[in-house]
Swiss-Prot record:
Its EC number is 1.2.1.41. Keywords: Amino-acid biosynthesis, Cytoplasm, NADP, Oxidoreductase, Proline biosynthesis. PANTHER family: DELTA-1-PYRROLINE-5-CARBOXYLATE SYNTHASE, GLUTAMATE SEMIALDEHYDE DEHYDROGENASE. Catalyzes the NADPH-dependent reduction of L-glutamate 5-phosphate into L-glutamate 5-semialdehyde and phosphate. The product spontaneously undergoes cyclization to form 1-pyrroline-5-carboxylate. The keyword Amino-acid biosynthesis applies. PROSITE patterns: PROA. It comes from Legionella pneumophila (strain Corby). This is Gamma-glutamyl phosphate reductase.
Length: 417
């Protein structure tokens, strides 16, 4: 292991003791101070962010994820305050019982320990991760991408300066160099890192999963479907599809494939009408293509190929699949889904119940945009990631997902026969 990384990781592991001694009220005050410092240094943050943006083409899908402006920084500070005001997740009594032999047994929440997060493009993640880890008593190791190096470095400086003002050990957070070559060393840090959470492309997630010797929670990759049922309301459908696809195309909860019941193909031109105003390219299957051929701009309409389905576009692109019934829609989703977010637009309650019950995803929706799959929107304050697996957490991961538990047993001298 590279000596510099080894030293950082050992210092981080040692700092868990100091972090556990910080009272909950103090953590809250420190986070609110950090939020104020973010607002105070908006211009400096933007200046550093511009250095990163200047090295990337505006047409790059990552550009929007990398961008920090005044509005986004204020929103970020507000998210930190929301996390600060959340109930303390530590020391929560999950179970308590008195045994016949007189033993008192409790099951209480505790921090996971040292959490490493590997992420790409989004510098706001740096603040989100720290605030959630700090509130939940976890040391955090940050491994951002080189494309956000200037922004991440400045945000880390703000965090550490805030901690110094309260005489807090700054080793409770560290930012590793952005070089990808160091990732394998981090993933092999058994005994020093308790959990790794990759946030980014499917390639990044696959690399981490396949090479890690430390526990991993997969997050981020979203191949998202919305099924417009035979009973779907056209007005709701237009709004939901437009929002899910175009609100922010670069996020993991953005719509990738629209599945439509064959009996509603006549409504397809109206369903996607607003998408053309934002130059959304549609990859339509044969039935959908025939309907849209004279009702959607030709330069934006392409005949779908097999590889267009099961693809996370992260761009102004949408695949359309026609199905004869809801079973075929669910089968298509189960084949191509990344188990992130899936939605149905329907008025038939039996169709809604079938979809919500049978579709295997972290978040399933009826008559709402998948854009809501987000820690803040779920009332979690912020999220460290959106887990697409079932153990140890699923969906948006807030404070509770960053805790484990331990058993506390009190006795009066009991021994076991």
């Amino acid at each position: 292991m590279n000596i510099d990384i080894a030293n950082q990781l050992r210092a981080a592991k040692k700092a868990t003791t100091d972090l556990n001694l910080i009272q909950s009220d103090t953590r809250t005050i420190i986070l609110k101070t950090l939020a104020a410092n973010l607002e105070k240094h908006i211009e400096n943050i933007i200046q550093e962010n511009q250095k990163d943006l200047s090295l990337m083409l505006e047409q790059d899908p990552r550009y929007d994820r990398l961008l920090l402006n005044k509005e986004r920084i204020l929103s970020l500070a507000n998210d930190v305050r929301k996390v600060a005001d959340l109930p303390n997740p530590l020391g929560v009594n999950l179970l308590e019982k008195s045994m016949p032999n007189g033993l008192s047994i409790k099951k209480i929440t505790v921090p996971l320990g040292v959490i490493a997060v590997i992420y790409e493009s989004r510098p706001n993640v740096t603040i989100d991760i720290f605030s959630l880890c700090f509130k939940s008593g976890n040391v955090c190791i940050l491994k951002g991408g080189k494309e956000a190096h200037f922004t991440n470095s400045y945000l880390l400086l703000l965090i550490k300066n805030t901690l110094k003002n309260f005489n807090i050990n700054t080793d409770i957070v560290c930012l590793l160099p952005p070089e990808r070559a160091l990732m394998t060393q981090l993933l092999n840090a058994t005994g020093l890192v308790d959990l790794c959470i990759p946030r980014g492309s499917q390639n990044l997630i696959n690399f981490v999963r396949d090479n890690a010797k430390i526990p991993v929670i997969e997050t981020g990759a979203g191949i998202v479907h919305t099924y417009f049922d035979k009973s779907g309301d056209l007005g709701k459908g237009k709004k939901i599809i437009n929002n899910a696809k175009t609100r922010r195309v670069s996020v993991c909860n953005a719509l990738d494939t629209l599945i439509i019941h064959a009996d509603r193909l006549k409504d397809l031109p109206e369903l996607v009408e607003t998408l053309s105003q934002k130059n959304v390219i549609i990859y339509a299957d044969q039935d959908a293509y025939q309907v849209l051929d004279k009702n959607y701009p030709k330069q934006l309409l392409i005949k779908a190929k097999p590889q267009d389905f099961g693809h996370e576009f992260l761009d102004y692109k949408l695949a359309i699949k026609t199905v004869p019934n809801i079973k075929a829609a669910i089968d298509h989703i189960q084949q191509f889904s990344s188990h992130h977010s899936e939605a149905v637009i329907a008025e038939d309650e039996s169709a809604i119940d079938k979809f919500l019950t049978e579709v295997d995803a972290a978040a399933v929706y009826a008559n709402a945009s998948t854009s809501f799959t987000d820690g803040g929107e779920f009332g979690l304050g912020a999220e460290i990631g959106i887990s697409t697996q079932k153990v140890h957490a699923r969906g948006p991961m807030g404070l509770d997902a960053l805790t484990s538990y331990k058993w506390v047993i009190r006795g009066t001298g009991q021994i076991r026969n």
